[in-house]
Amino acid sequence: MSDPIDVAAETPGDGLPPLREVIATHGLDARRSLGQNFLFDLNLTGRIARAGGEIDQGTVIEIGPGPGGLTRALLGAGARRVIAIERDSRCRGVLAEIAAVWPGRLETIEGDALDIDVAALGEAPRRVIANLPYNVATPLLIGWLRHASAFERFVLMFQKEVVDRLAARPGTKDYGRLSVITQWLCEVRPLFDVNPRAFTPPPKVVSTVVRIDPRPQPLAPARMETLERVTAAAFGQRRKMLRASLKALGDAEGLCAAAGLDPTARAETIPVEGFAALARAVDAAGSV
């Protein structure tokens, strides 16, 4: 992964005003309550857009477009159709201006993405490409993963620590429930870091853009509901051995034996396939 990017140039190429001017004209001061941190650098947003792959097909879904920096980059990069979900009504005007420049290619939905069935929006293949509001980023991703087969790709910006957890390997401090569930369903590839100074206001942490590609099939057979319960039990007491942390699920040692796992192992050492085997054992035993 490259070092954090520290960029400030704004290079719009669509005839629309620079983002600083847009924000001033529309009174779009970033609001902490909405988790807003605006990206001004259109070179950077262009890089995010290009990571989406063949966006000239299907539908691109953007969450929290704000003043439209990434929206403009997506359309400029050839996105056939962009559906932008924005709960801040102040952004209505600027998004309408962008839509006028790209007629028929931008649809705006005013609302909370947590309440919207994103997996049913637009035509496949669906790609979610977004600088997510950090206060809802993880719940959004977990909700989408429950319908992972509806999506072709996610290109998302999170706090770096979240991406570290998404991509973590067994035996590392960042490995946990989020790592297991995400990697069971998807291939995870961190792309690049973004310096806080690229945002207004600058967040207190480095951000990371990550590409998440849903697998044609999960890494190993299991029911997601059971896998979620198993990982919740195991990582809820991550320093305990499995024979202790899994007691709430039934005969912990018997479940470990059925899954081919050492009952004295700890959750942080178990690979994704091991948790899938444990979920199958739980279902077979009728423990959940």
Swiss-Prot record:
GO molecular function list? 16S rRNA (adenine(1518)-N(6)/adenine(1519)-N(6))-dimethyltransferase activity; RNA binding
Q: Name one GO cellular component term.
A: cytosol
Which superkingdom heads the taxonomic lineage of this protein's source? Bacteria
Enzyme category, top tier: transferase
| Pfam families to which the protein is assigned, alphabetical | RrnaAD
The primary location reported for this protein is: cytoplasm
Q: Where, subcellularly, is it found?
A: Cytoplasm
Q: What is the lineage of its organism?
A: Bacteria, Pseudomonadati, Pseudomonadota, Alphaproteobacteria, Rhodospirillales
Give the protein name, as stated in the record: Ribosomal RNA small subunit methyltransferase A
Q: Which UniProt keywords are listed?
A: Cytoplasm, Methyltransferase, RNA-binding, rRNA processing, S-adenosyl-L-methionine, Transferase
Q: Spell out the family assignment given in the record's similarity comment.
A: Belongs to the class I-like SAM-binding methyltransferase superfamily. rRNA adenine N(6)-methyltransferase family. RsmA subfamily.
As its record notes, the protein acts as a catalyst of: adenosine(1518)/adenosine(1519) in 16S rRNA + 4 S-adenosyl-L-methionine = N(6)-dimethyladenosine(1518)/N(6)-dimethyladenosine(1519) in 16S rRNA + 4 S-adenosyl-L-homocysteine + 4 H(+)
What Enzyme Commission number(s) apply to this enzyme?
Answer: 2.1.1.182
Species assigned in the record? Rhodospirillum rubrum (strain ATCC 11170 / ATH 1.1.1 / DSM 467 / LMG 4362 / NCIMB 8255 / S1)
Q: Which InterPro entries match?
A: KsgA/Erm, rRNA_Ade_diMease-like_C, rRNA_Ade_Mease_Trfase_CS, rRNA_Ade_methylase_Trfase_N, rRNA_adenine_dimethylase, SAM-dependent_MTases_sf
Q: Which PROSITE patterns match?
A: RRNA_A_DIMETH (PS01131), SAM_RNA_A_N6_MT (PS51689)
Q: Which residues bind S-adenosyl-L-methionine?
A: N37, L39, G64, E86, D112, N131
Q: What does this protein do?
A: Specifically dimethylates two adjacent adenosines (A1518 and A1519) in the loop of a conserved hairpin near the 3'-end of 16S rRNA in the 30S particle. May play a critical role in biogenesis of 30S subunits.
